[in-house]
């Protein structure tokens, strides 16, 4: 039972909220219960860090590799809840149900990082995905009804990605006679000279690419980010990346290091994601849509670490995923606090933010600088390591193009910074009052993005150690 403790805590939490939907669906204490539950999940994840073992006949593995992701997910869930401003953007009558799906989605992600066969990975992926589909639809009613459109698009794209993934799984099983990752890693490298093996492996990646919003499964991101409530967008934009990168690294060990065609496919997806995301972000007026296209580009950067096909590259990819999650949570935290009513935040709405709340402005600017890859923040450290690793692996042209994309992204990030410091004399801006918890969250996010950028050694060592148990 100790091996399954974080997942058990999440399952019990979901059951508690299910009971609360019957007894106190509108209780103001729901958010407090959720915060306490997230702290419990973090504690149970930390307690299980040194545990190893297998469950369910080898389909579920507990190791340092899986447990480090569970700690990240636990901390991330707490930050999302702090970002959520008591989830005011969610329909009041469904708020208790929202918490159920929130914790079930995290449970699915935790199951993803521990799954050791492709069928278990699919089940965990679907648990997380279907919970998130419902979360998107539970936004407070919008005159344009964009939340319903976003939920339908999210569902349709997700089902399509799952269909591709299942198709690839069926061929892999037919070729190797196994669905477990260990036998697949033994047999698949010998089959990678066959077109059907390459095709099936590429199809297998569809579900992961969907979670990372990578080309060609990125189309859902802008509409879902725009249509979902700020709290839901903050979740969908961040925590699923942990589950996706954990599974993608496991998949990357299957074909062996000499499959040049797979490397070329990953390179193509990474570069197209970067160019498409950054070019589309240049013309966005809605802040959440801008961050969606930015996320597509950052997914391409994460892929640079994976296509190196060695632990050092995997370490860099995990570190950059952690950086991306922190940077985006910081941005969405600010977006949630300054959004008025149920409206989406436009770029022009950021005008005079520094005058209204210097601390919020500094938090937002720190997140933007980190996303842009400006030193000394965590985004710079992560990008530098990814580019250095890709260059060492011989991908010179890719590194040059990725560097160009970094320069391209500077334009729209620095434009947001400019607007934040601008003031509109004709429009009276009321000061934003922050509570003690909001101030503490701002300081925590700023400190995390700065200190992990300057002193990354400790977390990199922990990730390296975890990768030895992959």
UniProtKB/Swiss-Prot annotation:
Compartments in which it is found: Cell inner membrane
Q: Where are the transmembrane segments?
A: 2-22, 30-50, 62-82, 99-119, 155-175, 201-221, 234-254, 261-281, 290-310, 318-338, 360-380, 395-417, 443-463
Task: Please name the InterPro entries in this protein's record.
Answer: NADH-Q_OxRdtase_suN/2, ND/Mrp_TM
User: What's the chief localization of this chain?
Assistant: membrane
Q: Which GO terms describe its biological process?
A: ATP synthesis coupled electron transport
Q: How does it sit in the membrane?
A: Multi-pass membrane protein
Superkingdom, natural source: Bacteria
**Looking at its record, which EC class is this enzyme?**
translocase
- One Pfam family of this protein, by short name? Proton_antipo_M
One cellular component term (GO) for this entry is:
plasma membrane
GO MF annotations for this entry?
NADH dehydrogenase (ubiquinone) activity; NADH:ubiquinone reductase (non-electrogenic) activity; quinone binding
Record's PANTHER family?
NADH DEHYDROGENASE (PTHR22773)
Which HAMAP family does the annotation name?
Answer: NDH1_NuoN_1
Question: What is the annotated role of this protein in its UniProt record?
Answer: NDH-1 shuttles electrons from NADH, via FMN and iron-sulfur (Fe-S) centers, to quinones in the respiratory chain. The immediate electron acceptor for the enzyme in this species is believed to be ubiquinone. Couples the redox reaction to proton translocation (for every two electrons transferred, four hydrogen ions are translocated across the cytoplasmic membrane), and thus conserves the redox energy in a proton gradient.
Record's family? Belongs to the complex I subunit 2 family.
Q: What is this protein called?
A: NADH-quinone oxidoreductase subunit N
Tell me the organism: Desulfotalea psychrophila (strain LSv54 / DSM 12343)
């Amino acid at each position: 039972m100790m091996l399954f403790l974080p997942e058990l805590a999440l399952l019990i939490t979901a059951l508690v909220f299910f009971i609360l939907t019957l007894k106190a669906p509108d209780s103001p204490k729901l958010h407090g219960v959720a915060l306490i539950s997230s702290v419990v999940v973090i504690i149970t994840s930390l307690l299980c860090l040194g545990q190893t073992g297998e469950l369910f006949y080898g389909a579920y593995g507990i190791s340092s590799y899986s447990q480090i992701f569970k700690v990240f997910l636990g901390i991330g869930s707490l930050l999302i809840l702090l970002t959520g401003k008591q989830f005011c953007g969610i329909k009041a009558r469904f708020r208790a149900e929202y918490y159920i799906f929130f914790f079930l989605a995290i449970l699915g992600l935790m199951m993803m990082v521990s799954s050791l066969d492709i069928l278990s990975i699919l089940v965990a992926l679907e648990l997380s995905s279907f919970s998130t589909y419902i979360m998107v639809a539970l936004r407070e009613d919008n005159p344009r009804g964009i939340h319903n459109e976003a939920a339908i698009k999210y569902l349709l794209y997700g089902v399509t990605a799952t269909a591709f993934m299942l198709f690839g799984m069926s061929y892999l099983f037919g070729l190797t006679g196994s669905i477990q990752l260990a036998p697949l890693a033994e047999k698949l490298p010998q089959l990678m000279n066959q077109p059907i093996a390459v095709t099936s492996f590429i199809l297998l990646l569809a579900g992961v690419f969907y979670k990372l919003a990578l080309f060609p499964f990125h189309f859902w991101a802008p509409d879902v980010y725009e249509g979902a409530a700020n709290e839901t967008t903050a979740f969908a934009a961040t925590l699923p990346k942990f589950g996706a990168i954990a599974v993608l690294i496991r998949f990357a060990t299957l074909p062996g290091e000499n499959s040049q065609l797979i490397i070329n496919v990953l390179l193509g997806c990474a570069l197209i994601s970067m160019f498409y995301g950054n070019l589309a972000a240049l013309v966005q007026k809605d802040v959440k849509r801008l961050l969606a296209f930015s996320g597509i580009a950052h997914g391409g950067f994460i892929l640079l670490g994976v296509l190196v096909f060695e632990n050092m590259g995997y370490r860099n990819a995990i570190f950059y995923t952690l950086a991306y999650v922190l940077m985006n949570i910081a941005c969405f935290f600010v977006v949630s606090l300054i959004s008025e009513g149920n409206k989406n935040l436009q770029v022009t709405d950021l005008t005079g933010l520094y005058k209204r709340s210097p601390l919020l402005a500094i938090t937002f600017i720190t997140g933007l600088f980190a996303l842009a890859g400006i030193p000394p923040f965590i985004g710079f450290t992560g990008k530098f390591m990814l580019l250095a690793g890709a260059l060492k692996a011989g991908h010179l042209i890719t590194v040059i193009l990725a560097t160009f994309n970094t320069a391209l992204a500077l334009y729209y990030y620095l434009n947001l910074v400019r607007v934040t410091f601008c003031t509109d004399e004709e429009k009276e801006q009321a000061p934003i009052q922050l509570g003690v918890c909001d101030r503490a969250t701002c300081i925590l996010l700023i400190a995390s993005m700065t200190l992990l950028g300057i002193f990354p050694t400790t977390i990199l060592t922990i990730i390296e150690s975890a990768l030895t148990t992959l």
